[in-house]
């Protein structure tokens, strides 16, 4: 029986590999994911149960070494072509050469770096993704620091609080792991870590564009068309990005609509410190966007916008806090029947998707969760709105939930 299963998987793998070379863009990502999923099934079928624990330990050691190579910017110092010695790497940060060599050997052993001689290493196709603050690099470092550390404290956390879902803002695994249990919120813990930690968190929360696209799921083209036809008042804000960080999503949306949505009629809202950071960026499009520091938990000061856009915010909040935030947006909607609240989030499915389920376990550290379609429908209804449609991106678990006043 096992042999028959392996034969089937091998045939499927060969078929899907043949499709990769003919795909581009989003289709290429889907094809690669199918190949990886089948390969993972093959590994599961051929791995002896007694080998799993050892493999997990190898993975943990690899991640620890990779994080330190990132932290010390050693990956940035490895040339794009050619190699570098452990001696030169260690000298660049005044480190113990043997320490750097031992960590590097772990990355060589798992295929993340390539050994060109016993004392030299070079990049591989995969390691370059973790250098120079690329989106995957920032995502990994943020995930390691802000989620893996609390996960390691789960046994102690649940021993104290019992086998119940974490809730609230201060008595959660993340604050527990930081020694701030019952004293600080998660954001206060991150802020306490200083500007570098805050920047890593802000950048990391934007995620990896391939997995969490801001554009291409919901069609914003109608907004630009309405402007061109003079169908909206000239003083009406078009898109208000609530909790929009440094404007990454707005920039993606504007670019995707070929700039038919005027940037000066878009608004970026976030905490004052984040808005100050966005103001300092040298981006000609972002400079035209109106920036507004707000506490969106206390209310929505800008009324009457055509679209209020909330991306990757609600999954960090409890149902109670999310409903309160959405009620503020409901109250801000104009009478225009086209006015919308758009919620961009991952949505849980049955059977579970690995990526979304991972995000749900991450959110457990801060006392929140990822949600199903029914969960979002309940939130939206409680906030005085109705769901018009769930828009799903091809090959990703990210949705845009289109909402209007009930």
Swiss-Prot record:
Top EC category: transferase
Keyword field contains Lipid metabolism: no
Residues that bind S-adenosyl-L-methionine: 270, 312
Metabolic or biological pathway: Secondary metabolite biosynthesis; flavonoid biosynthesis
PROSITE patterns attached to this UniProt entry: SAM_OMT_II
A Pfam family hit: Methyltransf_2
Keywords in alphabetical order: Flavonoid biosynthesis, Methyltransferase, S-adenosyl-L-methionine, Transferase
Disruption phenotype: Impairs methylation of the flavonoid skeleton at position C3-OH.
Gene3D superfamilies tied to this protein: Vaccinia Virus protein VP39 (3.40.50.150), Winged helix-like DNA-binding domain superfamily/Winged helix DNA-binding domain (1.10.10.10)
InterPro entries per the UniProt record, alphabetical: COMT-like, O_MeTrfase_dom, SAM-dependent_MTases_sf, WH-like_DNA-bd_sf, WH_DNA-bd_sf
Active site per UniProt: 315
Family (UniProt): Belongs to the class I-like SAM-binding methyltransferase superfamily. Cation-independent O-methyltransferase family.
Function: Methyltransferase; part of the gene cluster that mediates the biosynthesis of chlorflavonin, a fungal flavonoid with acetolactate synthase inhibitory activity. Within the pathway, cfoD is responsible for the methylation at position C3-OH of flavonoid. The pathway begins with the PKS-NRPS hybrid synthetase cfoA that uses benzoic acid or p-hydroxybenzoic acid as a starter unit with four rounds of chain elongation using malonyl-CoA to form the chalcone skeleton.
Stored PANTHER family: O-METHYLTRANSFERASE ELCB, PUTATIVE (AFU_ORTHOLOGUE AFUA_4G14580)-RELATED
Protein name from the UniProt record: Methyltransferase cfoD
Organism this protein belongs to: Aspergillus candidus
């Amino acid at each position: 029986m096992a042999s028959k299963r392996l034969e089937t998987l091998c045939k499927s793998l060969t078929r899907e590999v043949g499709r990769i070379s003919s795909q581009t863009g989003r289709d290429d990502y889907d094809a690669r994911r199918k190949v990886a999923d089948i390969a993972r099934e093959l590994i599961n079928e051929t791995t002896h149960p007694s080998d799993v624990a050892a493999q997990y330990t190898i993975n943990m050691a690899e991640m620890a070494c990779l994080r330190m190579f990132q932290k010390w910017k050693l990956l940035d110092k490895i040339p794009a072509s050619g190699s570098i010695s452990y001696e030169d790497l260690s000298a660049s940060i005044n480190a113990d050469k043997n320490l750097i060599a031992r960590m590097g050997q772990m990355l060589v052993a798992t295929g993340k770096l390539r050994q060109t001689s016993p004392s030299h290493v070079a990049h591989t196709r995969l390691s370059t993704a973790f250098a120079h603050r690329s989106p995957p690099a920032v995502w990994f470092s943020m995930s390691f620091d802000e989620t893996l550390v609390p996960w390691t404290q789960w046994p102690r956390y649940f021993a104290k609080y019992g086998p119940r879902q974490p809730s609230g803002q201060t008595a959660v695994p993340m604050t527990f792991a930081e020694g701030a249990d019952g004293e600080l919120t998660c954001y206060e813990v991150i802020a306490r870590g200083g500007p570098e930690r805050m920047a890593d968190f802000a950048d990391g929360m934007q995620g990896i564009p391939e997995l969490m696209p801001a554009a291409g799921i919901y069609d914003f083209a109608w907004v630009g068309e309405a402007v061109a036809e003079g169908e909206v008042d000239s003083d009406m804000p078009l898109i208000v990005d609530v909790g929009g960080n440094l404007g990454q999503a707005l920039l993606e949306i504007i670019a995707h609509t070929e700039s038919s949505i005027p940037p000066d009629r878009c608004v970026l809202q976030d905490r004052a410190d984040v808005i100050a950071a966005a103001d300092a960026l040298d981006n000609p499009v972002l400079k035209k966007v109106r920036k507004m520091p707000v506490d969106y938990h206390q209310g929505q000061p800008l009324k009457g916008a055509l679209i209020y856009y909330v991306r990757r915010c609600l999954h960090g909040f409890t149902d109670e806090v999310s409903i309160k935030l959405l009620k503020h947006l409901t109250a801000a909607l104009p009478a225009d029947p086209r006015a919308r609240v758009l919620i961009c989030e991952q949505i849980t499915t049955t059977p579970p998707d690995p990526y979304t389920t991972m995000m749900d376990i991450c959110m457990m550290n801060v006392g929140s969760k990822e949600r199903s379609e029914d969960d979002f429908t309940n939130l939206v209804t409680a906030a005085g709105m109705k769901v018009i449609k769930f828009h799903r991106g091809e090959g990703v678990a990210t949705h845009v939930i289109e909402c209007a006043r009930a």
